[in-house]
Structure formats: C-alpha cells, structure tokens
C-alpha cells in the first residue's frame, strides 16, 4: 500500500474528518468515489461493540478548509463518534495503481524509502526512513544506526544525485547539518 494520508481529528458532528495529506495529488486521491485502503489492523477496538475500521473507505466528499486543511467525508461515516474511531488510520492506494513519474527529477516516496544515503566522498551515513512533506521543502529523514535521525532538506544543493538503480542517494550536507 502506498500511503496517501492519515486521518486526523473529527471536524464537526456529521462524520467529517481532517486528513494529513501525504501525496502530491490530493485532488485525485481524495476525489469523490475514490476507494482508499486502510492500514491493516488500524485502531483495533478495545471492546467487541466498538466500531471497527473497514479494509476500505470510499470518499464521499472532500474540501479544503482555510486553504490548508483537507476535510474528507467517507461513505458510511455519519457521526463524530465513528469519525473519532478512524483517527490515526493510514489510508492509501495499491502501488500497482500508481504510475511512475514522467519527470526524471520527480520521485514517489516509496521509491526513496530504504535507499542508502552516502556523502559525495562515498561515506555511508545510513538510509532514508521516510519523507516528511514540509511547506518550504520536502525533508529526507536519515536513519543512522545508534544515533538520532537527521532531517535533510530535499533540495538540489544538498541532494545532488538520486541513483534508484544503484539504491543510493548522494548528499552534500552543509557543515553541522548532521550534528543537529
């Protein structure tokens, strides 16, 4: 599954939820009628009578609130209690349904996660754990064995080369970036 969002808190009393968007194509992924898979085992209820998150959710409606928060209504989610039960659920699409980028300088998150990170001098630093999408620039989360994770801005000046075939990302970090 390719994660395209994480369901956040309910908005109002009619089942609408906030969604933390994790895709560059929210208008396509969250279009009315879109069927999204849910993370297996998401939000296992504490008692038998609790709402169980289904394996798929169908988007009924989606809209931007104040230009920055995506509000989504899913079919069958009719009140705040059910919306609250969805909180924290990851939603996504099958990787097979995602076309590869047409621009050679563009990558999907799942293509980068797990790649080795090396300096331009060839020193292995660790691997990419995930990509965080920040307002100014995307951030590569560098996981280093036995050390804290480091956020590396995904910009040409710091990440000059992505070698998917070779399974590596070459970085040229400015002084002190890896010490934070």
From Swiss-Prot:
GO biological process: ribosomal small subunit biogenesis; rRNA processing
HAMAP family: Ribosome_mat_RimM (MF_00014)
Gene Ontology molecular function: ribosome binding
UniProt organism field: Salinispora tropica (strain ATCC BAA-916 / DSM 44818 / JCM 13857 / NBRC 105044 / CNB-440)
Subunit structure: Binds ribosomal protein uS19.
The organism's place on the tree of life at top rank: Bacteria
Recorded GO CC terms: cytoplasm; ribosome
Keyword rRNA processing: yes
Name the UniProt record assigns to this protein: Ribosome maturation factor RimM
Domain notes: The PRC barrel domain binds ribosomal protein uS19.
């Amino acid at each position: 599954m390719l994660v395209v969002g994480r369901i956040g808190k309910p908005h109002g009393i009619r089942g609408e939820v906030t969604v933390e968007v994790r895709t560059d194509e929210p208008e396509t992924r969250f279009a009315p009628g879109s069927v999204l898979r849910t993370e297996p085992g998401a939000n296992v209820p504490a008692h038998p009578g609790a709402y169980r998150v289904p394996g798929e959710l169908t988007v009924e409606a989606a809209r931007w609130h104040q230009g920055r928060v995506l509000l989504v209504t899913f079919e069958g989610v009719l009140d705040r209690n059910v919306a609250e039960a969805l909180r924290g659920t990851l939603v996504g699409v099958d990787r097979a349904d995602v076309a590869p980028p047409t621009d050679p300088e563009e990558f999907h998150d799942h293509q980068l996660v797990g790649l080795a990170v090396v300096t331009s001098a060839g020193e292995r630093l660790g691997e990419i754990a995930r990509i965080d999408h920040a307002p100014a620039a995307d951030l590569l989360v560098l996981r280093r064995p036995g050390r804290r994770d480091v956020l590396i801005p995904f910009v040409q000046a710091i990440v000059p080369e992505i070698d998917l075939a070779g399974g590596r990302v070459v970085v040229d970090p400015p002084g002190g970036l890896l010490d934070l």
